Amino acid sequence: MDNNSVDSLIPIIITGPSGVGKGTLIDKLRKEYEGSFGHIVSHTTRKPREGEINGVHYHFTDIPTMTEGIKNGDFIEHANVHGNFYGTSKKALKDVSDKNKICILDIDVQGCESVKKANIPCKFIFISPPTFETLQERLIGRGTENEETLKKRLETAKKEMVYRDIPGFFDHVIVNNVLDVAYGELKSIISPFISFQSKSNK
């Protein structure tokens, strides 16, 4: 796929195992290109972590409410991760698109499968750790997981990294070993979208 060929602001989906640095990379993009991205706020049934704000980091909801929304077809993708539901609503996608902003989604591999099945054109990017052991060290170092949740996240990470090696499943794979190097790779993929969006707003 030609990185320089962009003729529409299709959503950009960034995925990868928990702890790989997806959020950090997205935050850097949003700071450098302030105003270009309309980061979509996903829904989740998990409890907020310290410092997380409802409507900013996630729309925090409960299982009955989210289950009803899924049944009604309100979500373009949803997944059950570590016993909690996550999902992206159609309304959130439309809100960003209507403002001529670039949609950037941080979703898991299950969510990617749902989007692919729905035939929604997207740019799929996988952020990979250099090794599984590195990821394990990062998760332990984060200090936010107990033994049970750490085990679950590592089991999920192993499954997700299998998808990384499926030919054609992702448009790009970026190894996040050195953050600035990984960010440089991500910028080179995203820059045609930034250029297209800037021209569209003129």
From Swiss-Prot:
- Which stretches make up the Guanylate kinase-like domain? 9-191
The Gene Ontology CC terms held by the record are: cytosol
Family per record:
Belongs to the guanylate kinase family.
Q: What is its EC number?
A: 2.7.4.8
Q: What does this protein do?
A: Essential for recycling GMP and indirectly, cGMP.
Instruction: Fetch the SUPFAM superfamilies from UniProt.
Output: P-loop containing nucleoside triphosphate hydrolases (SSF52540)
Q: How does it assemble?
A: Monomer.
| Positions contributing to ATP binding | 16-23
**What is the uppermost EC class here?**
transferase
Q: Where does the source fall among the domains of life?
A: Eukaryota
InterPro entries on file: GK/Ca_channel_bsu (IPR008145), Guanylate_kin-like_dom (IPR008144), Guanylate_kinase (IPR017665), Guanylate_kinase_CS (IPR020590), P-loop_NTPase (IPR027417)
UniProt catalytic activity: GMP + ATP = GDP + ADP
GO BP annotations, alphabetical order: purine nucleotide metabolic process
UniProt protein name: Guanylate kinase
